[in-house]
C-alpha cells in the first residue's frame, strides 16, 4: 500500500533539526530542468502564475535564484511542509522506525520535485502543480511531468503486499498522476462533517484528516488499504453506506470552527 499526499504552500525551515536520515530526491534531472525555467521568471510572472502578493512573489523569486537542484543540503520534506495536512501528520513526533516505514509507504506529490519521499531533502520553494508554466514539454506542469509521476509511483509500490495507491492528495496534485500509465489500483478518501442532518466536505478539516489518516497508517503499520477502514482519529468513523471499493468515506459530527489565528496559507 502506498499513500500519496499533496505538499503545502506553507513551509517551516526554522524549527530545530530532527535527528533523522536525509535522503536525496529521485527526480533531480527533471527538477533541474524546471528550476532553470523558474529562475527566469520575474516576481510579476510568479505573482500572475500563482496569484501571489507582491511580497510573496519577491520571496519566491529569491528562492528560485538561490535554488540548487543538486545540493545535498535541505530539510526533510515531511518536516518542511507546514500546512493542514502536515499538522495532522505530525511527522516530527515519529521515531526512526516509524519514519523508515513512512519512507517506504508515503509519497508527496510536488510541482517542482515530482514525487518526494518523506525524508527527501528539499529547499524552500513554491511551484503549484496547477500552474500554466511553459516548458519544452508543454504549457503546464501536467505536460511537463507526463507519465513520470505514475512511473515513480509504480516503482515505489514494488514489493508491497498490497499495491493499492491510497489517494489522500488534492485534485490539483492527483491530476499529475497519469492513470493510463499507473499500474496500481486506486482508492480515494473523503472526509465529511455532519451538521443539522447534512454532511459536507470542509476543506480545512479534510486536509487535516488526510494527514491524520497517513499518521494512522504509519502508527499501525497498515499494509492493506482495507485496514484503513479502522481509522478513528479526531472522531471520524468509516461510513460503509457512503463508501465504494474505490472511495472510502469517513464522517464525524462537525466540530466548532477552528481558531481565527490559524495560518491560512496551506
UniProtKB/Swiss-Prot annotation:
Pfam family, one: H2O2_YaaD
Stretches for region Disordered: 245-266
Record InterPro entries: YaaA
GO biological process, one term: response to hydroperoxide
Source organism, top-level taxon: Bacteria
GO cellular-component term (any): cytosol
Family: Belongs to the UPF0246 family.
Name under which the protein is recorded: UPF0246 protein PHZ_c0561
Amino acid at each position: 500500500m502506498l499513500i500519496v499526499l499533496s505538499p503545502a504552500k506553507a513551509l517551516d525551515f526554522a524549527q530545530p533539526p530532527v535527528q533523522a536520515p536525509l535522503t536525496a530526491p529521485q527526480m533531480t534531472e527533471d527538477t533541474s530542468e524546471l528550476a532553470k525555467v523558474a529562475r527566469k521568471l520575474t516576481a510579476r510572472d510568479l505573482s500572475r502564475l500563482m496569484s501571489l502578493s507582491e511580497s510573496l512573489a519577491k520571496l519566491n523569486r529569491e528562492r528560485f535564484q538561490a535554488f540548487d537542484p543538486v545540493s545535498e543540503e535541505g530539510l526533510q520534506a515531511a518536516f518542511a511542509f507546514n500546512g493542514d495536512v502536515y499538522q495532522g501528520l505530525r511527522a516530527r513526533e515519529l521515531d526512526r522506525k516509524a519514519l523508515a516505514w513512512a519512507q517506504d509507504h508515503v509519497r508527496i506529490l510536488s510541482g517542482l520535485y515530482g514525487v518526494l519521499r518523506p525524508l527527501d531533502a528539499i529547499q524552500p520553494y513554491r511551484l503549484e502543480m496547477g500552474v500554466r508554466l511553459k516548458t519544452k514539454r508543454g504549457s503546464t506542469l501536467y505536460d511537463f511531468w507526463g507519465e513520470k509521476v505514475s512511473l515513480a509511483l509504480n516503482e515505489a509500490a514494488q514489493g508491497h503486499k498490497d499495491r493499492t495507491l491510497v489517494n489522500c492528495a488534492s485534485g490539483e496534485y492527483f491530476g499529475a498522476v497519469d492513470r493510463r500509465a499507473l499500474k496500481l489500483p486506486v482508492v480515494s478518501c473523503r472526509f465529511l462533517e455532519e451538521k443539522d442532518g447534512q454532511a459536507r466536505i470542509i476543506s480545512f478539516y479534510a486536509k487535516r484528516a488526510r494527514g491524520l489518516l497517513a499518521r494512522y497508517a504509519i502508527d499501525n503499520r497498515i499494509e492493506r488499504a482495507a485496514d484503513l477502514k479502522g481509522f478513528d482519529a479526531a472522531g471520524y468513523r468509516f461510513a460503509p453506506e457512503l463508501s465504494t471499493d474505490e472511495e472510502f468515506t469517513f464522517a464525524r459530527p462537525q466540530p466548532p470552527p477552528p481558531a481565527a489565528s490559524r495560518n491560512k496559507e496551506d
